[in-house]
UniProtKB/Swiss-Prot annotation:
Name of the gene encoding the protein in the UniProt record: ATI1
Protein name per the record: ATG8-interacting protein 1
Lineage per the UniProt record: Eukaryota, Viridiplantae, Streptophyta, Embryophyta, Tracheophyta
One GO BP annotation of this record: protein targeting to vacuole involved in autophagy
Keyword terms of this UniProt record: Autophagy, Chloroplast, Endoplasmic reticulum, Membrane, Plastid, Protein transport, Stress response, Transmembrane, Transmembrane helix, Transport
Chief place where the protein resides: endoplasmic reticulum
Amino acid sequence: MANNEEHPPRGNEWEVVSLTSSAYAAAPGPYNVESRDVRKYDAYYGAETSRDLYMSEHFVFPPSEHENLPIDESLFVAEQRKDGRDLMLEGQGLSDQFHYEAGNNQQSIYGESALGSSRHMESFGSESAVYEHGLVDAEGNLDLHSDGEGEKDVKKSTHNLPCEAWWKRRAISMYSRTREANAIWSLFFAAAVTGLVVLGQRWQQERWQVLQLKWQSSISSEKLGRVLEPLSRLKDVIVRSNPQASLVRSGSSSEV
């Protein structure tokens, strides 16, 4: 009530105040600091006054101020509840662009909320992926560190072993190496034996071939001897039957 008494309503001030182009073009006065209640009051009733002035068509608003006029939310809600809200808006001198801009504002609000939720989900997913990646890296580093420590522990244990255990370890390693060497030597020995067997078989084959040649040559010489033996006998018989001819031949041969 105190606020209403101190500041009377300004809804009908335009009826008594004559606005001219020179007064409208004049520069605004100095900025006065007002209280919070006064600002709310001025914003509400100033919006109503400006709307009434605009409806009265006393003057034309500049484009910049026409676009930034405050909107009376109570009037807008009341008119939306009516069936002919578009007609009412047109009757008051407001264009359809007002309704279109309001719808766009609502859509932008929902779009921003959806975008914010999607961004929130994306950021949450990226943070979870980064967290999981960090866990995997940490586990890998722990595994590598544990492997390095295990190798160091094995080396220390080998250096700190007592003499008997060290000798047993060396004996086992030598036995494993000898087994590997024995396997290699066994393969080498088997290859050598197979080579000797092959060479022996070839030598036997060649020996049999030589024996066959000798036997064939002996057989041929025996056959030749058998053929020549009767001829030699025939010659002896002829010589014995003609002793003079043999003497003449012997004499002629001596003279020569």
